[in-house]
A protein has these predicted regions:
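Glycine-rich loop at the start of a catalytic domain that most often binds anionic cofactors/ligands
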Residues: 4-20
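Positively charged, Gly/Ser-enriched RNA/tRNA-binding surfaces
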Residues: 3-4, 23-25, 34-47, 55-108, ...
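Short internal beta-strands
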Residues: 113-117, 301-304
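Internal, well-ordered alpha-helical segments in soluble enzyme and binding-protein domains
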Residues: 94, 118-121, 140-143, 180, ...
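Short, conserved secondary-structure transition motifs
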Residues: 115-129, 144-152
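Short glycine/threonine-rich loop-to-helix capping motif typified by GTGT followed
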Residues: 10, 123-133, 225-231, 288
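A charged helix-plus-loop insertion that forms the helical arch/lid used to bind
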Residues: 133-144, 155-159
Length: 312
């Protein structure tokens, strides 16, 4: 459980969202993402790896969360990261990379959008709200991260006393006052980039002639280890559930800068940034496009017991 980033157990057990069990005196957990294990690897092999260290990985991860259309408790995740550089060109390149991946999958530029924001935006927001409690900040971040899936009215309940879903499960809220919630709502309506890191990334996008992005302060990303620019990829076409009903699908990928995560596993100053895509989630959405087809190929093994039949 010591390699799951945000979910480092600082109480009696890891936080919700992780499949965990106790083995004598310590907690063991299924891999929640591919980023935190990378940070642990970098910390243990810091002197041996080149800087910046670039890597990509495919791997299975598990989420102890309520499943839904395109949302699974076990799924395949693609991850790409830059480790050991503060240069924001790395962040911009990862946004372009995720764009190229989607277009290789058959999507057109009109089918998706890369949204960018910065964790510095929420840092200023918490200062304005005069909120310092890490637990309360964590609840607020998770609530804001659900806006694209639940909508503002339902996310607002999570900012206040809490929310009961259709199954009757109740999620405790952040207990914010009405005026605090209003401050957040107004801040999310601001569409002008107001942080230096976002402005610099936009300049790099322009030099790449990359236009498939927009600034969106509602992009939060629920994980606490993000420290700077954050990005998210949303689809622009309708996605339906198994009953054929249109749904708010949310993002199919995203990421951001996590300059302090490696230091959780060693006394190192090692900036990093990365992106990830939920492949099962992406395929669920792609299968609903009328013009999308998966080219399925598979090996065929033929056992021959008579050498004289080889030519046949």
């Amino acid at each position: 459980s010591d390699s799951i980033g945000k979910f480092l157990p600082d109480k009696d057990r890891p936080d919700e969202g992780v499949f965990s069990f106790k083995d004598e005196t310590k907690w063991l957990s299924l891999r929640y993402d591919l980023t935190a294990p990378l940070a642990r690897y970098v910390a243990k092999n810091y002197l041996e790896i080149p800087k910046p260290f670039k890597r990509y990985q495919l791997g299975t991860v598990w989420r102890n969360e309520k499943p839904g259309p395109g949302r699974y408790r076990e799924f395949l995740q693609f991850d790409a990261d830059y480790v050991g550089t503060k240069n924001l060109q790395a962040d911009a390149e990862l946004c372009v990379l995720i764009s190229e991946i989607l277009e290789k999958c058959g999507l057109n530029k009109i089918d998706y959008i890369v949204k960018i924001s910065s964790r510095k935006f929420t840092d200023k927001l918490f200062e304005q709200l005069k909120i310092k409690s890490k637990d309360q900040i964590s609840i607020i971040l998770r609530a804001l991260d659900k806006i694209d899936r639940l909508g503002w009215s339902e996310a607002q309940k999570l900012l206040e006393k809490g929310r009961e879903d259709k199954s009757g499960d109740f999620t405790k809220g952040a207990n914010l006052k009405k005026d605090q919630v209003k401050i957040i709502e107004n801040a999310l309506k601001n569409k002008n980039p107001n942080s230096e890191d976002v402005l610099e990334i936009i300049k790099i996008f322009e030099s790449y002639n990359f236009k498939n992005y927009k600034f969106d302060p509602s992009v939060i990303r629920g994980l606490e280890y993000y420290t700077g620019p954050i990005f998210e990829v949303n689809l622009n076409f309708d996605v339906k559930n198994l009953k054929g009903q249109p749904i708010q699908f949310g993002s199919i990928g995203g990421g951001g800068r996590y300059d302090n995560l490696v230091s959780n596993f060693g006394n190192l100053d090692c900036p990093a940034t990365g992106i990830s895509i939920g492949l099962d989630r992406l395929v669920f959405a792609l299968m609903q496009k009328k013009d999308f087809r998966i080219k399925a190929t598979r090996p065929v093994v033929i056992c021959i017991f008579d050498k004289s039949k080889m030519k046949e």
